[in-house]
């Protein structure tokens, strides 16, 4: 819901070693209803797409060329100010509770994701996703 209010165009759940969306029966339908409610609330012109879960390695490979890629990573460079979005599509990858496995992190880095630290504190998955979306929205405004 909050991601849609911030203008996120697509929510792509990913299956990882520490967090499997396949166990979340019924979640997609709920998220779609929340996206519709957020569209009405925010008066945005486009409905956020809620995609079917994909394995992380496939999800990062299937991003369009030219898409800016950011990995929420406690060891990454601290974000400062707004990103230089300027209308370029962006993808934020937020890991599950406990973080990504090293092989998953390596796959994201190999796919061009840049590690960024969204806060000094360790954030929960939902909070990190909101922090990334708000940060990206600043650069797209």
State each model region's role:
Residues 20-21, 88-91, 139:
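A short, structure-level motif marking secondary-structure boundaries and short turns
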Residues 66-109, 113-118:
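Active-site/ligand-binding-proximal alpha/beta "capping" segment
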Residues 20-23, 100, 124-125:
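Secondary-structure boundary/capping motif
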Residues 55, 99, 128:
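Residue-level recognition of oxygen-bearing side chains
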Residues 54-60, 76-79, 123-124:
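A short acidic, often aromatic-flanked loop/helix-cap motif at beta-alpha or helix-coil junctions
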Residues 102-141:
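Structured adenosyl-cofactor binding patch, chiefly the S-adenosyl-L-methionine
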Residues 4-5, 76, 107, 129:
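Hydrophobic side chains within alpha-helical segments
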Residues 1-70:
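RNA substrate-binding interface of SAM-dependent RNA methyltransferases
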């Amino acid at each position: 819901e909050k991601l849609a209010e911030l203008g996120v165009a697509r929510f792509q759940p990913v299956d990882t070693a520490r967090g499997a969306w396949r166990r979340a029966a019924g979640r997609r339908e709920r998220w779609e209803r929340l996206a519709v409610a957020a569209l009405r609330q925010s008066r945005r012109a486009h409905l956020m797409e809620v995609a079917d879960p994909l394995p992380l390695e496939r999800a990062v490979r299937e991003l369009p060329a030219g898409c800016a890629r950011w990995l929420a990573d406690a060891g990454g460079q601290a974000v400062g100010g707004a990103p230089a979005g300027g209308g370029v599509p962006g993808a934020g990858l937020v890991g599950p509770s406990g973080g990504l496995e090293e092989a998953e992190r390596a796959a994201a880095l190999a796919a061009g994701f840049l590690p960024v630290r969204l806060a000094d504190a360790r954030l929960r998955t939902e909070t990190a996703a909101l922090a990334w979306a708000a940060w990206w929205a600043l650069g797209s405004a």
